[in-house]
Regions:
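Short, conserved active-site entrance elements at the starts or edges of catalytic domains
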Residues: 15-65, 101, 108
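Surface-exposed charge patches
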Residues: 2, 45, 96-100
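Conserved beta-strand and immediately adjacent loop positions that scaffold enzyme active sites
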Residues: 1, 54, 71
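Conserved catalytic-core subdomain
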Residues: 8, 64-168
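Structured loop/turn residues at beta-strand edges in well-structured enzyme cores
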Residues: 5, 50, 120
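Structural motif
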Residues: 1-2, 47, 64, 117
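Single conserved hydrophobic/aromatic residue that forms the stacking wall/gate
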Residues: 1-6, 10-11
Length: 168
């Protein structure tokens, strides 16, 4: 269930996985570990069986962690970004680059615990990752999100940064 918005791809539907990221003291969560991929693969397959294109992973405490293969950001009504603290998932290179790009554009970034109960407080959402780069999310469960200028601007800046590095 994917849609194209201009040249931007967005994930239309996401569910919240019943599988959770393990506690930090149970597995090396800050590395690409095969056991962690299994949890994400189970979550992705479960989502697809339910008619969703992706799944939102929660951490061991029940807070928002990431997508099955990408980090996640939310945008609030003040155009500030919120992203989970990377304490149970890989702090991706693309995630780090997006945080730096946002700061260079004077966009505040809050790295913090995000409860699933807060999903309705945000009006924008996107994923970051090597494959995803910056991919807007249209909805998670019953919460709808807009593809706004902040997200499109970050996507354009990231695209320019990547092309610039590839040309060098």
């Amino acid at each position: 269930k994917q849609c194209l918005v201009g040249s931007e791809m967005c994930i239309r539907d996401r569910n919240i996985s019943k599988w959770r990221r393990p506690a930090p003291n149970t597995i090396p969560w800050d590395a690409k570990a095969a056991g962690l991929y299994m949890i994400c693969t189970l979550s992705k397959h479960e989502a697809e069986q339910q008619g969703y294109s992706e799944s939102l992973m929660l951490d061991f405490e029940g807070n928002v962690a990431e997508g099955t293969s990408a980090n996640i950001f939310f945008k609030d009504k003040n155009n500030e970004l919120h992203t989970p603290t990377p304490d149970s998932f890989l702090n991706g290179i693309t995630r780090q680059a997006v945080i730096e790009l946002a700061k260079s554009k004077n966009i505040k970034v809050h790295e913090r615990k995000i409860s699933p109960d807060e999903l309705g407080n945000f009006d924008g959402c996107f994923l970051t990752g090597t494959a995803a780069e910056i991919t807007p999310v249209a909805s998670i469960a019953d919460h709808k999100y807009k593809i706004c200028d902040v997200i499109l601007g970050l996507s354009k800046s990231f695209d320019q940064l990547v092309r610039q590095k590839k040309a060098a």
